[in-house]
Amino acid sequence: MNRPAIAKFRGAGIGGLSLAFTLGALPLLADTPAVTVTAPRELEQLRNEVDTFVSSAITRPYGDDSLLRWDHPVCPLVAGMPRGAGEFALLRLSQIARSAHVPLGSETCRPNLFVIVAQNPERFLRLWWRHDPRLFNTRFGVAPVKRFIEYSRPVRVWYNAAVTGGDNGVVLGNLLATSTDPGGGLVDYPVFAGPSILGSRITRTVVQSISSAIVVVDLAQVSKLNIGQLVDYIGLVGLAEINLDKDVGEAPTILKVFSATSIPPPPEMTVWDKALLQSLYTTPQRNRMQLSQMETATLKLLAAR
């Protein structure tokens, strides 16, 4: 088994919990051509579409908080998939992360990106939470956690984050928590940020960094996807805080695989998705204009193709 350096695969369980879920209903990834932007577009039209896509797809932070991303090595663990599908998922997630310049952990890293396929996600999450009461971190009690557990969607995501120095140094705050469910929002712990030479009107003293993420797939709701579509979708929502309830406009994106439209969804992550991720990880997180810089960077990447 040729595993990527960061890869960890578990087909049996997580934290002592048994998993008996399979992905037998998912077809394998077919050989499909890459999705590219081929229709001629005027630059201004492309800019408008890119701005809509980036500003809608990326979850806007509260107040003066930075955008959320992985600033420390990500280490995925996959559970609930057959071995072949699990190995494919880990390899593909590694490829997505590398191409977007996401830091990756070593072969012996401790898992912090949990990808779980479950037949009954709500029941599994309740059992896992009971087994590990510190699994979710939130300042305002258990309400955000319950929303995350109880709200049904094909793929749900929970991010635990830490506040770090603007140079990605020492952790300054306890864990934060945010989920993609309606009303989940960012729930933060109070953090003291004293005077710093890093802070200014255009730069932040501290930034938010994902410390762990939980991606839970409802097997019954993804049966129409092939394994490639599913893993690419997981890669995007697991590496960036995506707003799953916003309309991203006309952009061709893997985020539309669950949209109820007559237009066939992309067979894999598109160049728009790749540009979005790359722009998130190549623009300065401390800069208060990062979202605008992401729009510019994404436009340049797409226009160059």
Give the residues covered by each predicted segment.
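Acidic/histidine-rich, surface-exposed loop or edge segments in extracytoplasmic proteins
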Residues: A34-V35, S66-M81
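Compositionally biased P/S/T/G-rich terminal and signal peptide-adjacent segments
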Residues: E44-W70
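Boundary at the C-terminal end of the N-terminal hydrophobic targeting segment
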Residues: L28-D31
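Long, folded non-catalytic interaction modules
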Residues: R47, L77-R92, H101-R305
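N-terminal post-signal-peptidase region of extra-cytosolic proteins
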Residues: F53-Y62, Q95-V102, S200
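N-terminal secretory signal peptides that target proteins for export/translocation
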Residues: M1-G11
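Bacterial N-terminal signal peptides
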Residues: G15-A25
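N-terminal secretion/transport leader regions
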Residues: P33-L43
